[in-house]
Amino acid sequence: MLSREYLTQEFTDLIQKLYPEAGIILSYCYVKILECYIERSKKKFYYLGIYYPDNIQFKVKEYHNSIKEIAESIGLVEVVYISATKIVRDPVSRLKKDNPRLWLELYWVVTQRI
């Protein structure tokens, strides 16, 4: 089984090679492989999570078909778009305490300027 970090890097490399414009947009996002385990069927499913800043939301979703095509070609089930801005600015979010590294990564994504 390949690691999630390796799959993320492979996805990023493929996007940059096949769709350079989408690669530029995704360089302003945080891309991560998310795992879903369904206990009943004892199966793991992997999703592509794209955390984006609100100022490029429409640019990211513009390349949805290209992103989904490559994600499916490497065995991922679905592509999920998540607003990093909303997560970082949510006053009741426990992410900063529970996973400070992810919170810092998302904060970095939100503060970038295009």
Per-region residue spans from a language model:
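A short interface-forming secondary-structure element
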Residues: 41-68
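Extended, charge-rich low-complexity interaction segments
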Residues: 104-114
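Generic "edge-of-domain/loop-turn" microfeature
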Residues: 38, 57, 86-88
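Generic surface-pattern signal
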Residues: 16, 20, 72, 111-112
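Hydrophobic beta-strand residues in large extracellular and virion-surface proteins
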Residues: 31, 48, 79-82
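N-proximal, solvent-exposed amphipathic alpha-helical segments enriched in charged/polar residues
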Residues: 1-43
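A short amphipathic beta-strand at an alpha->beta junction
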Residues: 68-101
